[in-house]
């Protein structure tokens, strides 16, 4: 189910009311496999390949728009359930449990996220960063006269691909300065 404002929006271009009241839910099939291997008493490796296939995704007909990329407060056009989406990737986790005051966690995701809008063309989604790497590491020391207090030092590092965007259509935006910026839908994300 999409946010409620999607279903009750009035069309900006036609003036019709509640143009999306008959919109159906987005549907999906999920596949995931988890492989966990204990490398030692305190070290765990986990690998999780996955695939998600979305269908009946609301899109604007003959446009690259899809609710899968939605960030706007509301959509002002009629939507149809003709879009698709797919997310394929693998998550890898290496976790060193707290041992002798030391721990770390490394997670990596490599993925591809695509959607098919009302234009029938497969595009990258706005969120197709392709990779994310997180590292967390820490050390703890017992301190105090009775060694009942903990002093810890921790660090976190994140590296990820950039968020995608559609480029501005300069000519169209300048031709209508009284309207908001217009984007080049033929080069979506």
What label would you give each PLM region?
Residues 43-46, 57-59, 63-64, 102, ...:
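Short acidic, gly/pro-rich beta-turn/loop elements at beta-sheet edges
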Residues 51-53, 71-161:
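Gram-negative outer-membrane beta-barrel transporters
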Residues 182-189:
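Short, intrinsically disordered, charge-balanced linker/junction segments flanking boundaries
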């Amino acid at each position: 189910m999409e946010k409620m404002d999607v279903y009750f929006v009035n069309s900006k271009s036609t003036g019709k009311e509640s143009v999306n009241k008959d919109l159906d839910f987005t549907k999906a099939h999920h596949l995931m496999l988890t492989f966990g291997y204990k490398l030692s008493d305190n070290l765990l490796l986990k690998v999780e390949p996955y695939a998600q296939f979305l269908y009946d995704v609301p899109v604007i007909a003959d446009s690259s728009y899809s609710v899968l990329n939605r960030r706007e407060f509301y959509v002002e056009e009629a939507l149809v359930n003709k879009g698709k989406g797919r997310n394929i990737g693998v998550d890898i986790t290496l976790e060193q449990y707290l041992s002798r005051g030391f721990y770390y966690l490394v997670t990596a995701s490599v993925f591809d996220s695509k959607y098919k809008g009302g234009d029938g063309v497969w595009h990258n989604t706005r969120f197709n960063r392709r990779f994310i790497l997180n590292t967390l590491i820490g050390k703890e020391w017992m301190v105090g006269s009775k060694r009942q207090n903990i002093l810890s030092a921790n660090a976190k590092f994140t590296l990820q691909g950039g968020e995608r965007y559609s480029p501005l259509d300069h000519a169209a935006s300048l031709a209508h300065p009284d309207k908001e910026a217009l984007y080049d839908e033929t080069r979506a994300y």
